[in-house]
């Protein structure tokens, strides 16, 4: 009975507790939305990246328009026809320079707009691009515009907050030195002829072919045909007054040996309608000596061979534009102009 009474009392207490009112639960605080993550700032490109961007922008836009030129491959055969095109060549040279400036300026401004690292830009265009070089390029190259664009150099530097862009248009060596010897020599002959005979306005020059040479340099030269008569025919009319004579002639019997005046490298062995069979040697000081009208093409030497002063390079002949056996000697200076060989040989032969 006692156990039953205890169970009843416990049940009554639990029921009473269940009937008691409960206090309302405190409301949960409202949950704030999570803040969006702050995006990381876009990193500024470094100086090298900016310079690369500027160069890429230049080359993407630089495309000089040479659609008005005709590939002629005239060489030295039709100089009057080439000179008639001088205004076109001068215009192409000026346009190319202007286009280079415009493309460099635009590329620099584009880079400036993309970076707070740059406040100012500076553009410089340099190069020896004139109508004579353009004439050689248009005459000897199928696509001179693409060649000029490909050999244009662009350097970009950053000094402080200034972007400096320097565009260097190609000179003769950049355009032609890497090419095959026939193209290189043809272009050089033409370019040097134009430099020697015409000014910037294609007016004929009164050029006596003088060039200052030191006694030390003269000592490196020998007379190729001692005791033979040397004719000073520099700058005389040739080919019915369509061109000037770029050298001096030395009379000699056919098959007489021709030694090299200087030590140097054989850069050209070939034939053309004016020079006939010829050999050209570039000496150790950058002068080119061409020996023309040889009786036959020299086969015992090859282009690229080294020859020493006095070494046999061929034999006197009467080939090409010649009416009697003789050696035509021409000399091209490192500045790409022909010089008169007569006073050079006179100093070698007579010491004055």
Give residue ranges: language-model regions.
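Glycine-centered tight beta-turn/hairpin loop motif at sheet-sheet or coil-to-beta transitions
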Residues: 160, 284-286, 336
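Non-catalytic extracellular/periplasmic "stalk"
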Residues: 21-225
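C-terminal motif of bacterial Sec signal peptides marking the signal peptidase cleavage site
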Residues: 12-13
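Surface-exposed, glycine-biased beta-strand/turn segments
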Residues: 189-277, 309
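Zn2+-dependent peptidoglycan hydrolase active-site motif and core
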Residues: 245-246, 260-300, 325-330
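Conserved, short, structured surface segments that act as functional micro-motifs
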Residues: 279-282, 305-352
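Residue-level recognition of beta-strand microenvironments
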Residues: 233, 269-270, 294, 316-319
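Sec-dependent N-terminal signal peptides
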Residues: 1-7
